[in-house]
C-alpha cells in the first residue's frame, strides 16, 4: 500500500501543476491545450493504465486493511483506548478515503468520462481557442465550479486528502523501512508541507472560480485588487 500511495503522490503533483493552467487569463487556451495533450499523447495514454492499476490496487489494499483491522479489534480487548494509542487521522483513514473515493467517482464522470467517451463537451464553445477542434474542457470546469454542491464536495474531498496525505506520507516511508532517528522528523515535516500544499492548491481552484469569476471564467469587476494581482501572476 505504501508503494502505490507514494506513486499516487507523484500523480497528484503532476495533476496539480497541470491544473494550475486554469488560472491563466487566456480564456482557457492553455488548459485546453494541456488537456488535449494529456488525452491524445500515446505515452500519456499508456501511463494512464498504470495509474488506473495504481488507484485500483491502492483502494483494494485499503479495504483489505480495513477488514483486517476490524477483525483484529473484534478479537481484542473490549476497551483498548485507541483514541490514546493512535492519531485521529490513522483511526479515520477509512472515512477519509471513502470521501475521496466518492469525490473521485463524481470527478472522473464529470470530466474524464465526458471528455473521453461521452463526447458532449464539443458544444461548449471554442471561439476563444487557438485550435478550434479541441473540446472546451475549460468551460466544463468553470461551469462545474459554479455549482455550490460540487464546490462543497470538492473542498471537503481536498480536506480529506490533506489529512490522508498527512498520515500516509510518513507511514509510507516507515512501511518501506525508511525509519531513522535522524531522518524521520524531516520526513514528517516534508509530509506535512506536501499535504498542505497539494490539498490547498486543489481546493483553491473551485473556490476561486465560484467566488471571483463569472460563468465564462472571467474575473468579476468587484474582485479585490490583491486577489486579482495574485491570479494575474499565473
Predicted regions and their residues:
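Membrane-embedded alpha-helical bundles that constitute the cytochrome b-like, heme-associated redox core
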Residues: 1-234
Amino acid at each position: 500500500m505504501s508503494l502505490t500511495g507514494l506513486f499516487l503522490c507523484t500523480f497528484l503533483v503532476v495533476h496539480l501543476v497541470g491544473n494550475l493552467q486554469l488560472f491563466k487569463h487566456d480564456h482557457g487556451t492553455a488548459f485546453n491545450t494541456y488537456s488535449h495533450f494529456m488525452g491524445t499523447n500515446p505515452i500519456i495514454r499508456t501511463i494512464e493504465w498504470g495509474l488506473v492499476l495504481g488507484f485500483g490496487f491502492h483502494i483494494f489494499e485499503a479495504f483489505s486493511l480495513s477488514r483486517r483491522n476490524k477483525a483484529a479489534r473484534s478479537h481484542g480487548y473490549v476497551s483498548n483506548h485507541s483514541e490514546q494509542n493512535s492519531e485521529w487521522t490513522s483511526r479515520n483513514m477509512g472515512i477519509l478515503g471513502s470521501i475521496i473515493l466518492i469525490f473521485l467517482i463524481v470527478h472522473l464522470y464529470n470530466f474524464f468520462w465526458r471528455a473521453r467517451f461521452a463526447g458532449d463537451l464539443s458544444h461548449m464553445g471554442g471561439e476563444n481557442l487557438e485550435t478550434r477542434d479541441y473540446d472546451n474542457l475549460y468551460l466544463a470546469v468553470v461551469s462545474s465550479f459554479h455549482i455550490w454542491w460540487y464546490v462543497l464536495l470538492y473542498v471537503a474531498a481536498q480536506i480529506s486528502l490533506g489529512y490522508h496525505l498527512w498520515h500516509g506520507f510518513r507511514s509510507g516511508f516507515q512501511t518501506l523501512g525508511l525509519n531513522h532517528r535522524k531522518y524521520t522528523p524531516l520526513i514528517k515535516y516534508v509530509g506535512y508541507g506536501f499535504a498542505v500544499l497539494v490539498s490547498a492548491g486543489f481546493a483553491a481552484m473551485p473556490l476561486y472560480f465560484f467566488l471571483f469569476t463569472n460563468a465564462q471564467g472571467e474575473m468579476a469587476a468587484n474582485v479585490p485588487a490583491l486577489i486579482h494581482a495574485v491570479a494575474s501572476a499565473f
